[in-house]
Regions:
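Anaerobic metallocofactor- and corrinoid-dependent redox/one-carbon enzyme cores
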Residues: 2-21, 27-36, 44, 172-526
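Long, compositionally biased, glycine/small-hydrophobic-enriched stretches that function as flexible linkers
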Residues: 2-207, 211, 231, 238-241, ...
Length: 526
């Protein structure tokens, strides 16, 4: 499987065209090609399921789980991907199917326009599957999502599906993404309570410790339960920071807060942490020798040679005993390179918190105290051009409120921008998965202000895209009617000229330019 590859699903695609001999993410030609083989087998399963009735959910659950393994920065273990391919083939045999998997190569579609439409749909679908997989871990699922996943994969598998049909499915993918995010929000809040506003400290303690990175809250819950009386502290890294805002997690005194920065700073953060690291979703970078002997993966994450915590059995927890035993033997964390931050950034501005005072916020808008809301959300990455998001936030006038979700927050979440009539100018909504809260807040603000359409709200969007969850969020926003969204630091490599024409003409999608120019344009509603 070694040799050539083609992958352009993330923002780090080489030359903004595509990676052909390994990716900066750590993907090799072997794992890239295996992931494409897996998707081809999943298409065959979807083609088999399409039109059938009375089929159990187990096949849809498998598709969602397997698609989640193909997100950027998730699974670089060939053995694990081979196992998923074999599982797909077993599903076909169970279904008594003679459907053959289509050509797995992205480049097998020679027409670049058609290829772009197909891959745009697949990448949005990956984001939907990731949201759904997180909800499924908590026992929540929705047939509307499963039915769409099967329909969309089937359409992408058929060589005669016209790009007009694919375009309609891309739009529908945005609608389903909203449903998937709403489902995940319901799962999280039903299980752990609604996030509450709080400061989250970034400060190293004196006990041996475990650092959990990723976005799967169920894993953190089970780890906290298993370490409750172990005199081991637990910290969060990257997007897992949001867990500190849920009431169910805050009852654990050994959950100490955040450590380090965004997912991509993990090489330095994991090295200085000293303790054990567990990565549970799409945020793993190439593992460095400084911490190779004390990192574990779980969920759909995989790195060859790194120990893996296997799936939980029904009615049981995952077994973190090996992680805990190793943590006992290791020294406490040292301060991260960024140093301690106490009391830490304010987080927990979920829709339940913000919407409870939405009428008051609307009055501040009507009085001119708040002139505009700027949503700076999405994922972070290594690209130096992402410093734009820091400078943009600094350039925004003092009568603006910044809403953020996802790793993009780490570009500015420790800045002190003050408050407007008691409202913090930076409102951290949560993970990229929690972008649903931004949608809910916007809809409630629309109601409170009596504005007919969402695109007329005093709200501007600047998305920091990196991977497929942000693609799904982007599609959800477009489907709901938001316009003039800025997307950076670059446009996706899979945006063909035809796709770009539609996005700019019909939705007003824009590239980022300079922080000062974009800040001024957004204040004018552009």
């Amino acid at each position: 499987m070694e040799g050539s590859m083609f992958c352009y699903q993330c923002q780090e695609a080489f030359g903004n065209k595509g990676c052909t001999s390994g990716g900066r993410c750590g993907e090799t030609s072997e794992t890239a090609n295996l992931q494409e083989r897996l998707i081809a087998e999943l298409k065959a399963v979807a083609l088999t399921l399409e039109g059938r009735t009375n089929v159990t959910r187990e096949f849809s659950r498998f598709i969602v789980r397997a698609m989640s393994a193909t997100l950027t920065d998730t699974n670089f273990n060939p053995d694990r991907i081979y196992a998923l391919i074999d599982e797909a083939k077993r599903a076909l045999r169970t279904l008594d199917s003679d459907v053959q998997a289509p050509d797995p190569s992205i480049l097998s579609v020679e027409d670049t326009e058609e290829r772009s439409y197909r891959e745009f749909l697949i990448y949005g679908l990956k984001g939907v599957c990731a949201f759904t997989f997180h909800a499924l871990a908590l026992g929540y699922e929705d047939n509307a999502i499963y039915n769409f996943v099967i329909k969309a994969l089937s359409a992408a598998a058929k060589p005669d599906t016209p790009h007009e049909r694919l375009a309609l499915l891309i739009v529908e993918c945005g609608r389903i993404a909203s449903i998937a995010m709403a489902l995940l929000d319901e799962a999280n809040t039903d299980t752990y309570g609604s996030p509450t506003i709080c400061h989250i400290p970034f400060e190293a303690g004196h006990n041996p410790a475990i650092l959990m990175a990723g976005q799967d809250l169920k894993d953190l819950e089970e780890l906290l339960i298993q370490t409750e009386h172990a005199e081991i502290d637990v910290y969060t890294h990257g997007d897992m920071l949001t867990a500190n805002t849920y009431p169910a997690f805050r009852r654990f005194p050994h959950l100490k807060g955040g450590y380090g920065g965004s997912w991509w700073t993990q090489a330095q953060d994991f090295a200085s942490f000293n303790g054990v690291i567990v990565v549970n979703s799409n945020c793993i970078a190439p593992v460095q020798d400084a911490y190779r002997g004390r990192i574990f993966t779980t969920g759909m994450v995989g790195i060859k040679g790194i120990p893996h915590i296997t799936h939980r059995h029904i009615g049981m927890q995952k077994d973190f005993s090996e992680v805990i035993a190793l943590a006992r033997t290791l020294p406490p964390p040292t301060e991260a390179e960024s140093g301690p931050v106490v009391p830490g950034p304010m987080c927990g501005f979920g829709h339940n918190q913000v919407c409870s005072v939405i009428n008051q916020i609307a009055r501040y808008v009507e009085s001119g105290s708040i002139r505009r809301f700027i949503v700076v959300a999405g994922e972070d990455g290594r690209d130096e051009r992402r410093e734009y998001y820091t400078e943009l936030v600094k350039a925004l006038p003092a009568d603006t409120v910044i809403l953020t979700a996802g790793g993009a927050k780490y570009r500015f979440n420790k800045l002190d921008l003050g408050k407007i009539t008691g409202i913090p100018r930076i409102m951290d909504i949560g993970q990229i998965n929690d972008a649903y809260s931004i949608i809910r807040i916007a809809m409630e603000l629309q109601r409170a202000l009596g504005i007919r359409t969402l695109d007329k709200l005093p709200v501007s969007f600047v998305l920091s895209w990196y991977e497929q969850k942000t693609v799904a969020v982007f599609l959800a926003l477009l489907t709901l009617g938001f316009k003039n969204i800025r997307l950076g630091p670059t446009f996706p490599a899979f945006f063909s000229p035809g796709i770009l024409e539609v996005l700019t003409r019909d939705y007003g999608v824009k590239p980022i330019t300079t922080p000062e120019a974009d800040a001024a344009a957004m204040m004018e509603g552009n």
